[in-house]
UniProtKB/Swiss-Prot annotation:
Entry GO MF terms: GTP binding; phospholactate guanylyltransferase activity
Job description of the protein: Guanylyltransferase that catalyzes the activation of (2R)-3-phosphoglycerate (3PG) as 3-[(R)-glyceryl]-diphospho-5'-guanosine, via the condensation of 3PG with GTP. It is involved in the biosynthesis of a derivative of the hydride carrier cofactor coenzyme F420, 3PG-F420.
Record-given protein name: 3-phospho-D-glycerate guanylyltransferase
Species classification: Bacteria, Pseudomonadati, Pseudomonadota, Alphaproteobacteria, Caulobacterales
The protein's annotated pathway: Cofactor biosynthesis; coenzyme F420 biosynthesis
Length: 218
């Protein structure tokens, strides 16, 4: 069974690249909606696939929401970036489940589907590392690591290539999982339009409903 770690930052300053589309309050609500939709998706993963979900966040409200949804929460004292958040989550998970597989997910995948997580974990049975390529910037939508395999998260733009280089340097077998729900992170206005056009989590769809109206009016 795997330990899933989500890293997410909320509050009024979250998702600043969406400021042209959403107000501060709307962006904060969007982050909350995406987190809860992702937790729902992970809860629907195949029997025994995900043992526990950890949420790493510096945001008090997200801490409360994640805990109420049944996640284990690690509260960061201050925002320190995505990779620092994942390192924090990895350390905590290693203490409680040192022999578990690990799945790292940024908290902005509003179309996440349980079956795509299952597909990644199925590949992990025969590989040391599984990656999902983000569609727009070459980033990483998912990073899954087999139990006991040493690996350092390097999320960010073009990070999928960095992760693959690190795997080669360490002599690790690596597979790519092709899944649309792991490729679309909602970070820019054009991402919001794409998510609004298709199926996504219920809460995210509600927050995006106003954007849909604006888009149709154009």
């Amino acid at each position: 069974m795997a330990e899933a770690i989500l890293a997410v930052r909320g509050g009024l300053g979250a998702k600043s690249r969406l400021a042209a589309v959403f107000s501060d309050a709307e962006r904060a609500a969007l982050v909350e909606a995406m987190l809860l939709d992702m937790l729902d998706a992970l809860a629907g993963a195949g029997a025994g696939a995900v043992r526990r979900v950890w949420v790493v966040t510096p945001t008090e409200r997200l801490e409360r929401l994640a805990a109420a949804a049944g996640a284990r929460v690690i509260r960061e004292p201050r925002p320190a970036g995505l990779n620092a958040a994942f390192r924090c989550g990895l350390a905590a998970a290693a203490e409680e489940a040192p022999y578990a597989d690990i799945v790292l997910l940024p908290g902005d995948l509003p179309t996440l589907r349980a079956q795509d997580v299952d597909a990644a974990l199925l590949l992990l049975r025969t590989h040391d590392l599984v990656l999902a390529l983000a569609s727009r910037d070459g980033g990483t939508g998912l990073l899954a690591v087999r139990a006991g395999v040493p690996f350092t998260p390097q999320f960010g733009a073009q990070s999928c290539a960095r992760h693959r280089r690190q795997a080669r340097a360490r002599g690790l077998s690596c597979a790519l999982v092709e899944a649309g729900s792991l490729a679309l992170d909602l970070d820019r206005p054009e991402d919001a339009v794409e998510v609004a056009r298709g199926p996504c989590g219920r809460r995210t769809a509600e927050v995006l409903s106003d954007l849909k109206s604006r888009w149709r009016a154009q």
